[in-house]
Amino acid sequence: MPHDPSFTPTQLAARAAYLLRGNDLGTMTTAAPLLYPHMWSWDAAFVAIGLAPLSVERAVVELDTLLSAQWRNGMIPHIVFANGVDGYFPGPARWATATLADNAPRNRLTSGITQPPVHAIAVQRILEHARTRGRSTRAVAEAFLDRRWGDLMRWHRWLAECRDRNERGRITLYHGWESGMDNSPRWDSAYANVVPGKLPEYQRADNVIITDPSQRPSDGEYDRYLWLLEEMKAVRYDDERLPSVMSFQVEDVFFSAIFSVACQVLAEIGEDYKRPHADVKDLYLWAERFRAGVVETTDQRTGAARDFDVLAEKWLVTETAAQFAPLLCGGLPHDRERALLKLLEGPRFCGHPDLKYGLIPSTSPVSRDFRPREYWRGPVWPVLTWLFSWCFARRGWAERARLLRQEGLRQASDGSFAEYYEPFTGEPLGSMQQSWTAAAVLDWLG
């Protein structure tokens, strides 16, 4: 029999815990040791989920560090820069938020954009683990909730009020990086309308670390990414002025579904821990508004969700994992939801005959936009597998959740904890020793 190189669950959990300790800077965990040597917002939430079974206290520190960098307007920035650490571009000097943005924190260097709001899920997982521990651990988790409830509410209120000004139930993004799915085909047509002016010179860091160009965005794409920063800097990151200057403005259906779920989760926490009634009421209202906003985007026949280009005033139809946003938050009529599940489990996605594992590729293998090695244009992301599995379990789809967890662990059993994986061969790609991949494994293994 051929030798099976995979690790047992016990070995895998030990390696994942060791990885998180290795990436720990003391009060923050780097997203990855080389490519991402700082704290990323949604990475930090997933890291806290992975830390919770190991140490509720350390998981609380992770979220405390992130929230200490929250902007005065309520935004949680997508990067909190580690002090004295270089090696990532664009760094704090390029963002210049400390000198330009009135709302930026004075004690931390951050980026000037945001990322998906998965943090309430992390808070819930921390509280769930704390309930199984001793009194002192429960006290740590509950003290965190007391200390940070107002900050979590400001975060959700900023998204609901500043990024959904017309109350359509969909979050507007001003940069593809805000979606977390940086170079997804979802944004191709919106980026095509971004025409860079004269950019200050720059030297990328990502393609020095990941030398295979098929795994990373092109230089032309990077020019557009950086031009959007210049547009933001020109108005000093002012929420009121961004809509009048940004050449990238899209309503992100996947971000909006996550926000709906997060509002629902935070409302339930608020009820359980007797937070102000007005806060809980707002959270339930936002959960419903964004659930309805997601459903409004869906195809009448298949249930597939679409993004919306605000400037071009058109729907963005692409075959990516974001199509399945309504499966996260619910709200679809029964027949449409059944059709969407059939699409997910059929040959265009998880049921494609050539997939190494029955997992959700970031872009459909039958799409003309599919590139099996390139970032969000095809590879399978363990963190996305975790998110769908967790949401499916929450919705009562125990068998679907179990299958995703089972296949996710099979994929991760090589022990590389890669950022993403080639969908046909299972080859680990992108950054190795990725913290949120280790975190997903730790949560799955309990």
Curated annotation (Swiss-Prot):
Catalytic activity annotation: (2R)-2-O-(alpha-D-glucopyranosyl)-glycerate + H2O = (R)-glycerate + D-glucose
One Pfam entry name: MGH1-like_GH
Stored Gene3D superfamilies: 1.50.10.10
Active site as annotated: D182, E419
Record's keyword terms, sorted: Glycosidase, Hydrolase, Stress response
Thermal dependence of catalysis: Optimum temperature is 50-55 degrees Celsius (tag-less variant). Optimum temperature is 42 degrees Celsius (C-terminally tagged variant).
UniProt induction comment: Up-regulated in response to nitrogen shock.
Activity at various pH: Optimum pH is 6.0 (tag-less variant). Optimum pH is 5.8 (C-terminally tagged variant).
EC number of the protein: 3.2.1.208
Protein biosynthesis among keywords: no
Activity: how regulated: Activity is not dependent on divalent cations, but it is enhanced by Mg(2+).
Flavoprotein listed as a keyword: no
An MF annotation (GO) of this entry: Glc3Man9GlcNAc2 oligosaccharide glucosidase activity
UniProt binding sites for substrate: Y36, W40, S41, W42, D43, Y88, Q115, G180, R216, Y375, W376, Q434
One example of a Gene Ontology biological process annotation: oligosaccharide metabolic process
Quaternary structure (record): Homotetramer. Dimer of dimers.
Function: Catalyzes the hydrolysis of glucosylglycerate (GG) to glycerate and glucose. Involved in recovery from nitrogen starvation by promoting the rapid mobilization of the glucosylglycerate that accumulates under these conditions. Can also hydrolyze mannosylglycerate (MG), with tenfold lower efficiency.
Family, similarity comment: Belongs to the glycosyl hydrolase 63 family.
Protein name as it appears in the record: Glucosylglycerate hydrolase
Organism, as annotated: Mycolicibacterium hassiacum (strain DSM 44199 / CIP 105218 / JCM 12690 / 3849) (Mycobacterium hassiacum)
Classification lineage: Bacteria, Bacillati, Actinomycetota, Actinomycetes, Mycobacteriales
Gene from which the chain derives: ggh
